[in-house]
Amino acid sequence: MIKDSSVQVEGQEKVCLDQWVAHYRTYAAKGRSASYIPALGEINVSQLGICIVKPDGTMIKSGDWEIPFTLQSISKVIGFIAACLSRGISYVLERVDVEPTGDAFNSIIRLEIHKPGKPFNPMINAGAITIASLLPGTSVQEKLESIYVLIEKMIEKRPAINEIVFQSEWETAHRNRALAYYLKENGFLESDVEETLEVYLKQCSIEINTEDIALIGLILAHDGYHPIRKEQVLPKEVARLTKALMLTCGMYNASGKFAAFIGLPAKSGVSGGIMTLVPSKSRKDLSFQDGCGIGIYGPAIDEYGNSLPGIMLLEHIAKEWDLSIF
């Protein structure tokens, strides 16, 4: 039974979130949609929503939290986990490194000048495309099934692809094709180029909402343990490695700034989503001391491809509630 004091605290948290979402929504006009993917260019960029999930299942939601959007680069987290589960961490890291890069997420430069062909990390396009080729199965559908099964295991519902977004990405994936063929030439891509691209772009086009990614964040916050179901759904080693990569590489080439000023493991996508998490804290006087998962949606993105109002909202929350892991 929830105590009255807990209800009161959660009510205060909801009031704060509503105020902060309303405030930072006004900054959406300073961002832009990811118009290089035509289907994303049509989205209303004034939207902003958030969902916070606590270990007891309590959810605090505000703004446009329920609006569906595509995972885009947040799917790189899922793909990496799925590959590690099926191939093992050591095998995966032979083909993708774990080093941050200051280049844009779709850059090809470092593939040519450092360890030719080996992607720096799985949170950039080159790394995620390589990961897509490592997924179990011999067909596009079989490889995607490992993604679907993993997501369903965590959020308890079967994901679906937004076919309009997928077709839009498929028709404009020229840079990703260049990356894939370069990776294939250097022996890091295990599957056919076009099939691998289809897997990658379809996983990016999976549709979710802030509640879904907040649940995934909650599981990662607890090292792969699902505190609501009281079940270990991911190996601890995989969850911890994933969080480390999110912290160092998850926010494109703004990852260092994000770690310095917000201080949480996170992964963003150009659709405007941000999946982040707060590990449990040793200081029990702090807000969310038992950890939580956070999902944010704000499709107005900045020059790095991250949600502009979403990052501003998250930075405010992290400061007000002292959420940084540092």
UniProtKB/Swiss-Prot annotation:
Q: Which InterPro entries match?
A: Beta-lactam/transpept-like, Glutaminase
Protein name per the record: Glutaminase 2
Alphabetized UniProt keyword annotations: Hydrolase
The organism encoding this protein is Bacillus anthracis
**What positions belong to coiled-coil segments?**
none
Any one of the GO BP annotations = glutamine catabolic process
- Family recorded in the similarity comment: Belongs to the glutaminase family.
Residues reported in the UniProt entry to bind substrate: 73, 125, 169, 176, 200, 252, 270
Q: What is its EC number?
A: 3.5.1.2
What this protein catalyses is: L-glutamine + H2O = L-glutamate + NH4(+)
Q: Which residues form the signal peptide?
A: none
Q: How does it assemble?
A: Homotetramer.
Entry keyword Hydrolase:
yes
